[in-house]
Amino acid sequence: MGKKKGKGAVGLIALVCEETGIRNYTTTKNRRNTQEKLELMKYCPSLRKHTLHKEGKIK
């Protein structure tokens, strides 16, 4: 038996670079505790500097 694929409390999200639009990182987020979108300063390998990464959908 497999797991159900529904909208649970913890979801998998992608972090998208604001300058390039590339999905560089994936992480999990508890949707009940943090309802707003994540915004983190992360390293972008294509630009070779730290840029703002925002939460996006995983395709």
Curated annotation (Swiss-Prot):
Keywords: Ribonucleoprotein, Ribosomal protein. It holds the Pfam family Ribosomal_L33. GO terms for cellular component: cytoplasm; ribonucleoprotein complex; ribosome. It comes from the Bacteria. GO terms for biological process: translation. One of its GO terms (molecular function) is structural constituent of ribosome. Coiled coil: none annotated. The keyword RNA-binding does not apply. HAMAP family: Ribosomal_bL33 (MF_00294). Belongs to the bacterial ribosomal protein bL33 family. This is Large ribosomal subunit protein bL33. It comes from Borrelia duttonii (strain Ly). The lineage of its organism: Bacteria, Pseudomonadati, Spirochaetota, Spirochaetia, Spirochaetales. The gene is rpmG.
